[in-house]
Amino acid sequence: MVRELLEKARGLSMFTAYNTNVDAIVYLNGETVQRLIDEFGAEAVKRRMEEYPREINEPLDFVARLVHALKTGKPMAVPLVNEELQAWFDSHFKYDVERMGGQAGIIANLLANLDFREVLVYTPHLAKRQAEMFVKKPNLFYPVVEGGKLVLKHPWEAYRENDPVKVNRIFEFRAGTTFRLGNETITVPFSGRFIVSARFESIRIYTEPELKPFLPEIGQRVDGAILSGYQGIKLRYSDGKDANYYLREAKKDILLLKREKDVKVHLEFASIQNRELRKKVIYNLFPLVDSVGMDEAEIAYVLSALGYDKLAERIFTYNRIEDTVLGGKILIDEMNLELLQIHTIYYIMYIAHANNPLSEAELRQSLELATTLAASRASLGDIASPDQISVGMNVPYNERGEYVKLRFEEAKRRLRTKEYKLVIIPTRLVQNPVSTVGLGDTISTGAFTSYLAMLKEKGEL
């Protein structure tokens, strides 16, 4: 079933934007973590952990947030705002791998490797180092304007010499890694990653003015669009521009994509630490898109920004399925979304309105494809061809699968769900993943494209 659905999805033409970067990856071990703690002293690290810095301005901020992530075993991303710290990172770590990062870049490479009919990727910054991170596939294109016309080139032929490059440093950690923090011995409970995301003035999220008039043509050409990277917008810039300016432009982009035909747009949401900015992104963009994807921490952040602080706190503290379902219902109604997809370590969930053209069984198939693709990626580190989905098909569902289904049925009984289609599936969980980077993006891509493929088959696209 999964294979047939992927086959249908591969007939689609997709557009993805905006964020790409170079991911410099470090595979952490206990000794490296210990060395960092010893360099600053356990007491200083503990004090800074209590302060919980929201961004990285100096090395101790980094060490404190890293140790916190390792202790909880939760994947986290913290912005690096001090460009001068790049040299400190480069002197302290040897990068094990350099590869494509940023949601739009990861999604573009995935779709190209899965042999989708046509993949258009746009990022406002395309330096040579960045362009070389794209897979060399004939179905992958970058839109440029030449002679007043839209021209599609392969990304590695469209780079611009003087564009800035964004480097995100990713620290992959494994469950079972141990180190000492003063008198305490810490064992990492889950595998995950800690991302130090570069948030510098030079990197912006926008569409170049000369390409903007051609967005309706792109929207007409494709079956769907996946937009991401809004977490990279800053509240204020030194040149006088601010988040409001870039969000106004982002709204124009979505409306232009939808001008000639109402192309379905999925927004892949990522954690935004600043509450004010988070609120702006939600209120400006969510009402314009059809589908949103996020993880359970992100839905708590979103609910908190919408004023549902108690519910957000419950999701953060207890992680109960019924709270996530309740939060999802609130979000889909307040933002008038067609589809909300929430992915966690143990389950993936869809929430749609009852009048959605797809049945709950079809929505479930879409999620099955999503978790199978993610399991293939976790097992192999990347997906190089459509055949590799068979790897994910051999990965068992996680051990909490039955418990997840039970709690979901309880939640449905307890909450009013008649006006909704609610679907949940347990994830296929790889015990020792080669990499955890891009798994959420892979889930959202598999889910949204298979959703579109089934809509198309019903004549609803």
Curated annotation (Swiss-Prot):
Pathway: Carbohydrate degradation; glycolysis
Cofactor binding comment, as recorded: Binds 1 Mg(2+) ion per subunit.
Cofactor(s) this protein cannot do without: Mg(2+)
Cross-referenced Pfam families: ADP_PFK_GK (PF04587)
First-tier enzyme category under EC: transferase
Localization of this protein: Cytoplasm
SUPFAM superfamilies: Ribokinase-like
Enzyme Commission number: 2.7.1.146
Entry keyword set: Cytoplasm, Glycolysis, Kinase, Magnesium, Metal-binding, Transferase
InterPro entries reported in the protein's UniProt record: ADP_PFK/GK, ADP_PFK/GK_arc, ADP_PFK_arc, Ribokinase-like
Domain annotation ADPK: ranges: 1-457
GO biological process: carbohydrate metabolic process; fructose metabolic process; glycolytic process
Catalytic reaction annotation: beta-D-fructose 6-phosphate + ADP = beta-D-fructose 1,6-bisphosphate + AMP + H(+)
HAMAP family: ADP_PFKinase
Family statement: Belongs to the carbohydrate kinase PfkC family.
Name of the protein described by the UniProt record: ADP-specific phosphofructokinase
Originating gene: pfkC
